[in-house]
Swiss-Prot record:
It comes from the Viruses. One of its GO terms (molecular function) is cyclic-nucleotide phosphodiesterase activity. This is Gene 66 protein. The lineage of its organism: Viruses, Duplodnaviria, Heunggongvirae, Uroviricota, Caudoviricetes. InterPro entries: Calcineurin-like_PHP_ApaH (IPR004843), Metallo-depent_PP-like (IPR029052).
Length: 199
């Protein structure tokens, strides 16, 4: 049986982000590889909600090599540091390299999450939250999904806060800066059920 995992903002090879992540220790990328390899099985699905690297061509190639060596089926929701994102003119050129590693790549996706009382609800996946950023300015607004009431799993903010009732209680941050780990579907399902129950 396969499991489903979520994460965001890996930033493989990104020295500034690694420095800010004191929890990851001196070898950030090795620490993330160990976390991944200990939990993810060959048939598991890992949704990466953007920013595999710092965005330069060499950094992207290194991050793709890092991902290629990790178990599981990787699905990438493109972020602002991922060059295949349509915000970049050279997106088609680098997309081919990404497809060698990924089995899905898009700017957004929708998943069904089971509800405790039966049935399911739809959640959206995007790198960008409905609202929030790690700067004072709300950047990349033209690439953000419009909030029409669906729960949103996101990254981008580099916040340690998983769910904020002050910004939008229907968005869940699955980034490494909040979790320090991959997020299993069971955790997401629990939070989604809490939101649907008004908690």
């Amino acid at each position: 049986m396969s499991n489903v995992w979520f994460t965001s903002d890996l930033h493989i090879g990104h020295a500034k982000v690694a420095e800010d992540r004191d929890w990851a220790g001196p070898d950030h990328d090795l620490h993330l590889a160990e976390l991944w390899d200990e939990q993810v099985g060959k048939e598991d699905v890992v949704w990466i909600l953007g920013d595999i690297s710092s965005g330069g061509t060499r950094a992207q190639l290194d991050a793709l090599g890092w991902l290629l060596n990790r178990p599981g089926r990787k699905r990438l929701i493109l972020g602002n540091h991922d060059r295949p994102h349509p915000m970049y003119r050279d997106a088609p050129r680098l997309s081919r390299l990404y497809w060698n590693v990924l089995d899905y790549m898009s700017t957004a996706a929708r998943l069904r999450v089971p509800l405790d009382g039966g049935g399911h609800t739809n959640v959206l996946l995007s790198h960008f939250p409905y609202v929030g950023d790690h700067t004072a300015e709300q950047r990349f607004t033209q690439w953000r999904l419009r909030d029409e009431g669906l729960i949103l799993l996101h990254g981008h903010t580099h916040s340690r806060i998983i769910r904020s009732t002050m910004t939008n209680p229907r968005q869940i941050h699955v980034g490494l800066d909040a979790w320090h780990d991959l997020v299993p579907m069971d955790e997401v399902r629990e939070m989604v059920n809490d939101i649907e129950e008004g908690l």
